[in-house]
Amino acid sequence: MANEGHRPDRLTLWQRSTLRRMRKASRKREGEPLTSEDWSTYYRLMSSRSSRFWMGLLRSLPSSPRCGICGAPFAGFGSRLVKPLGYRPSRKNPTLCDTCIEASPPGGMTTEVGVLFADLRGFTRLSEQSDPEAVSALLRRFYACAERVLFPEAIIDKLIGDEVMALYLPMYGKLEDPATTMLEQSRELLARVGYGSAEGPFVEVGIGLDYGEAFVGNVGERSLYDFTAIGDVVNVASRLQGEAKGGEIVASGGLVERLMAPVGERVEVSLKGKAAPVLAYRVS
């Protein structure tokens, strides 16, 4: 359990070093509130060469699922190696590990972020008509496809029943062209599910994409952190996903304008909570 300051009781040497360097750079004592500038420093250090090397080692270990940030395995042989170091699923956010969720200070910063929502179509009907174990196996298969395609460029923020939410954060230094990466990975995810194959998809999936500014960081009290993004860009991506048919990607105009050339069919869609129609592109 973390103490009342901003430094948890148990961190890896790498994370202790990152926090120490961040506080030195921002001239902040332990326990002092952090500003957006401090968070910017923290993320820059988290994406340093040494940090990327360490995360590369974690990702090379076998077994899935993994932490959505650092890639530490949560199952199999790989998890037995890293669990003593604190790399186990966090009770606050089980898609992230204890060390990542505890290492980040409370609060966050406003920054650019890409948001992806992928949702299973007809899941309620499928749940009513199928055996619960079969439904669970289908969900695990879908989650595994999402993890293989989206990681490590994206942080898998949430697995919400029949839905995946992923964040693309340029501030982590992994993405040179986040809009292109988001579109390419969305297409690859649909291909992994089976669209375009002779057998067809094993489940119907629709995807919504948006890109813009949002508040990103640890939201909530220390006893119940949730590393996530909050803002209109999240709401729009979620609503666009609701507009997507099975096998279709609906991307916002804000994301498509960052691409080298427009893609798909230009449309205007009416979204809940929006006074005016929103420009979007349907990509099949």
Question: PLM ranges: what are they?
Answer:
Residues 2-68:
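A broadly conserved sequence feature marking short terminus-proximal activation segments
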Residues 243-284:
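Cytosolic regulatory/linker segments at or just downstream of nucleotide-handling modules
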